[in-house]
């Protein structure tokens, strides 16, 4: 019945700050869409929609709180390269590299947080 995930939505206090961070730090591409100029961040065949907390015409989960997401991104880079890049941009790695099990099997992951506190995992299947 299901074949994949199209997008996820992050409830945000500061849309511009979040969009800027994901563009500059992770290299995601900003997309403005819809009549009310919603902001999404695209990468590969996926996207993250940034929803302002309190948006009246945009349905969301029952708890409208920033910093509650836990997202795993996949990289084809060596994690040592990713760590060096993130450190250069001032991002604190809070855990890793550590072994994890992803949807395709064993992977190695590092963890950091976005500006509003959501947990971001960056994983590689190529390091095992």
Name each region found by the language model.
Residues 119-122:
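Short glycine-/small-residue motifs
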Residues 17-19, 78-83:
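Short, conserved charged micro-motifs
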Residues 12-14:
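Conserved beta-strand-loop-alpha-helix junction that forms the acyl-donor binding cleft
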């Amino acid at each position: 019945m299901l074949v994949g995930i199209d997008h996820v939505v992050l409830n945000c206090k500061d849309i511009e700050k979040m969009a800027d961070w994901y563009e500059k730090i992770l290299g995601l591409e900003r997309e403005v869409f819809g009549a009310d100029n919603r902001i999404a961040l695209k990468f590969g065949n996926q996207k993250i929609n940034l929803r302002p907390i309190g948006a009246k015409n945009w349905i969301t989960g029952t708890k409208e709180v920033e910093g509650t997401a836990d997202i795993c991104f996949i990289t084809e880079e060596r994690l040592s390269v990713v760590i060096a890049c993130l450190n250069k941009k001032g991002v604190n790695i809070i855990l890793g590299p550590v072994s994890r099990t992803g949807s395709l099997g064993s992977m190695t992951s590092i963890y950091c947080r976005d500006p509003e506190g959501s947990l971001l995992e960056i994983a590689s299947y190529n390091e095992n």
